[in-house]
């Protein structure tokens, strides 16, 4: 433990979550050091943000400062906030300090890491772009994820974000032998609780044998002080880095919601008395975002692929928070309410979702050509929808009618039964390889299945299943 005698200071001022502490001369903690007020369960951990001079430091609290008094003793731990890492974290829920909050006893982890760490050196990076196969047709074909890349997930309430996230967690464990870390940053406590319950129900978290779980959860919800919401993303990232660097695994890191990370930084910045920048955001917005995002990458040992839910304030994409986030993204997955209302799940919008990986020199000529064909067909269908609504399908030319028929089949074939939704849909989940997806869509667009009913393409895996389903429909 720390030699507390020489490292103890006292609180000189408390303003909400900001605590000023005076230390003896020559014993000042460094910036980002953790300092602790009190002992046991009632202790409050703060992180040093500024050295004020006159032997005083200004720190931001990670928990509520209720009950703290001036003159209370403060211990300098001499290190940043350190959190447990490794397999014992799987299936558990932690707070920003790495303390379990799921009432399942202490975490058995033997290793711990500080949340403030340098990004990997250039020499350690794996710079060759490679596609990260998810087994989800619409994602792999039309907006593929980069291994070690950053993906923005856009979608309103109730369009299937949570189910898509759980399926990705399930598939990375199934196909890549990887694990996931979920960072709940400044969102609703109820949503965090629902996600945990759904993960247990779908088998992503195995309560009987926690080591078999596929995900660790780190929550810093809306009711937490801004310091906790600002740092919870780093706690989740630190846990993910251990799986990448030490266990040499592919890791999925979910951050929900990246906007709340910026929002918390803005609150802390104002509390520390910094001059605000554009739209009232912190002047250090780009730096804070860069420090987090640069640690999310592929190394020669393993990869961290990050999926970040992005809340866009007032739907304004030019707002500094989403605009700064976009600069770091390699792909965007946009969920559409229109598709969800048609019952097409995953409700990923094939025309709005984008990826920097969709280039012939990266994915290959055949994949690229197939993706472009799908998009052209769906775009043409979208253009014809107004005419169909006014005049009806019969007024279209023969060629346009064929395009519409194929587009409707493509739209349905982009849907897929998920493993984690088996409980609700009754259909067994399907993992579809990229090669099977390309083959199926090529044959569909070439007209090979023009005589099959469109419902045979709905909620199936590969093209052979669609053919079998059509045979059953015709037999009836």
From Swiss-Prot:
Membrane topology recorded in Swiss-Prot or TrEMBL:
Peripheral membrane protein
Positions annotated to bind ATP: 155-162
Its keywords, alphabetically, are: ATP synthesis, ATP-binding, CF(1), Chloroplast, Hydrogen ion transport, Ion transport, Membrane, Nucleotide-binding, Plastid, Thylakoid, Translocase, Transport
Annotated PROSITE patterns: ATPASE_ALPHA_BETA
User: Which GO CC annotations does the UniProt entry carry?
Assistant: chloroplast thylakoid membrane; mitochondrion; proton-transporting ATP synthase complex
> Source organism's superkingdom?
Eukaryota
Fetch the SMART domains from UniProt.
Answer: AAA
Where does the record say this protein resides? Plastid, Chloroplast thylakoid membrane
Against InterPro entries, the record matches this protein to: AAA+_ATPase, ATP-synt_VA_C, ATP_synth_F1_bsu, ATPase_a/bsu_AS, ATPase_alpha/beta_chains, ATPase_F1/V1/A1_a/bsu_N, ATPase_F1/V1/A1_a/bsu_N_sf, ATPase_F1/V1/A1_a/bsu_nucl-bd
Predominant place of localization:
plastid
Task: Tell me one Pfam family matched here.
Answer: ATP-synt_ab_N
- For this protein, the Enzyme Commission number is 7.1.2.2
Q: Give the catalytic activity.
A: ATP + H2O + 4 H(+)(in) = ADP + phosphate + 5 H(+)(out)
Q: What class of enzyme is it?
A: translocase
Can you tell me which family this protein belongs to?
A: Belongs to the ATPase alpha/beta chains family.
Q: How does it assemble?
A: F-type ATPases have 2 components, CF(1) - the catalytic core - and CF(0) - the membrane proton channel. CF(1) has five subunits: alpha(3), beta(3), gamma(1), delta(1), epsilon(1). CF(0) has four main subunits: a(1), b(1), b'(1) and c(9-12).
Q: What is this protein called?
A: ATP synthase subunit beta, chloroplastic
Species of provenance: Emiliania huxleyi (Coccolithophore)
- Give the encoding gene's name: atpB
């Amino acid at each position: 433990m720390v030699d507390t005698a020489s490292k103890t200071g006292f609180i000189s001022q408390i303003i909400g979550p900001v605590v000023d502490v005076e230390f003896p001369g020559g014993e000042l903690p460094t910036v980002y050091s953790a300092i602790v007020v009190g002992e046991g369960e009632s202790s409050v951990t703060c992180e040093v943000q500024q050295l004020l001079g006159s032997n005083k430091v200004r720190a931001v609290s990670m928990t509520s400062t209720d009950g703290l008094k001036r003159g209370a003793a403060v211990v300098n731990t001499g290190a940043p906030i350190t959190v447990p890492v490794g397999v014992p974290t799987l299936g558990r829920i932690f707070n920003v300090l790495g303390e379990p909050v799921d009432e399942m006893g202490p975490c058995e982890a033997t290793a711990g890491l500080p949340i403030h760490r340098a990004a990997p050196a250039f020499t350690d990076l794996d710079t060759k772009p490679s596609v990260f196969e998810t087994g989800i047709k619409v994602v792999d074909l039309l907006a593929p994820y980069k291994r070690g890349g950053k993906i923005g997930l856009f979608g309103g309430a109730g369009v299937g974000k949570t189910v898509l996230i759980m399926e990705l967690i399930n598939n990375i464990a199934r196909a890549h032998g990887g694990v996931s870390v979920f960072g709940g940053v400044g969102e609703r406590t109820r949503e965090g609780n629902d996600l945990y319950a759904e993960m247990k129900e779908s088998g992503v978290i195995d309560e009987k044998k926690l080591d078999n779980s596929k995900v660790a959860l780190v929550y810093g919800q809306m009711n937490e002080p801004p310091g906790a919401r600002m740092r919870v993303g780093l706690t989740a990232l630190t846990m993910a880095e251990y799986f990448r660097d030490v266990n040499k695994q592919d890791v999925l890191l979910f951050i929900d919601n990246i906007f709340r990370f910026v929002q918390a930084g803005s609150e802390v910045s104002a509390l520390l008395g910094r001059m605000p920048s554009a739209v009232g955001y912190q002047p250090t917005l780009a730096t804070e975002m860069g420090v987090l995002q640069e640690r999310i990458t592929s190394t020669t040992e393993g990869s961290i692929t990050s999926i970040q839910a992005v809340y866009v304030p007032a739907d304004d994409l030019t707002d500094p928070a989403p605009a700064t986030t976009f600069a770091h993204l390699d792909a965007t997955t946009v969920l559409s309410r229109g598709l969800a209302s048609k019952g097409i799940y995953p409700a990923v919008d094939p025309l709005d979702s984008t990826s920097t990986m969709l280039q012939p020199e990266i994915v290959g000529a055949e994949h690229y050509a197939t993706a472009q064909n799908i998009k052209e067909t769906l775009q043409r269908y979208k253009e014809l929808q107004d005419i169909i609504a006014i005049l009806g399908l019969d007024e279209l030319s023969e060629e346009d009618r064929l395009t519409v028929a194929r587009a409707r089949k493509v739209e349905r074939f982009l849907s897929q039964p998920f493993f984690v939704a088996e409980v609700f849909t009754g259909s067994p989940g399907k993992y579809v390889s990229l090669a099977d997806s390309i083959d199926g869509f090529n044959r569909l667009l070439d007209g090979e299945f023009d005589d099959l009913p469109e419902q045979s393409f709905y909620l199936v895996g590969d093209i052979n299943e669609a053919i079998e389903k059509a045979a059953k429909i015709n037999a009836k």
